[in-house]
């Protein structure tokens, strides 16, 4: 994305507060091609999403082929809104911001999609906050990860687990989670 460098700084504590989002959780969705360019010491071309709308829904070889074709359009003068940056420099900035602010998280787009058990649903575009659960989304559906926990100590009676109480708690928690999804 053409604005990645500004995006990386959204959680910084310094600078113009109008350009900060202190409460927003942000992430970088990194394709394998970018990492290849980092390793090779190559350049990364930043595009406007309006000029490359299909990249969002591609991964792996399909993403790589489309991305390289857009770079050819830049070279041929067909695309004029772009910026080339050293991939390693951009990677270092991503890591610096992650270390400094805890954001944006880094998640790898291609492995998430290649290993997705839900490829029939479409391309994975995001994950939950901890990035261990991938979420399928599209123009009509937004995915949300609802988390919950059970305090097992509260289910002990004379040092033994009260299975009936635990079953009721889990059932109630499951219904509340389901209701939260339906009414959201």
Region annotations inferred by a language model:
Residues 2-163:
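Active-site cavity-forming subdomains of large catalytic enzyme subunits
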Residues 105, 146-149, 167-183:
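Long, well-ordered alpha-helical segments
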């Amino acid at each position: 994305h053409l604005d990645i460098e500004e995006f990386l700084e959204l959680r910084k504590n310094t600078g113009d507060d109008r350009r900060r989002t202190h409460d927003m959780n942000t992430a970088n969705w990194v394709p394998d091609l970018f990492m290849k360019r980092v390793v090779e010491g190559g350049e990364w071309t930043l595009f406007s999403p309006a000029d490359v709308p299909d990249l969002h829904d591609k991964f792996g070889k399909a993403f790589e082929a489309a991305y390289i074709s857009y770079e050819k359009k830049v070279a041929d003068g067909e695309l004029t809104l772009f910026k080339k940056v050293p991939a390693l420099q951009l990677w270092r900035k991503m890591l610096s911001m992650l270390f400094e602010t805890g954001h944006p998280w880094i998640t790898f787009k291609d492995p998430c999609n290649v290993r997705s058990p839900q490829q029939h649903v479409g391309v994975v575009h995001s994950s939950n906050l901890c990035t261990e659960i991938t979420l399928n989304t599209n123009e009509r559906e937004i995915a949300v990860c609802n988390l919950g926990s059970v305090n097992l100590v509260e289910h002990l009676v004379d040092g033994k687990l009260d299975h009936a109480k635990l079953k009721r708690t889990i059932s109630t928690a499951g219904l509340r989670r389901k209701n939260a999804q339906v009414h959201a």
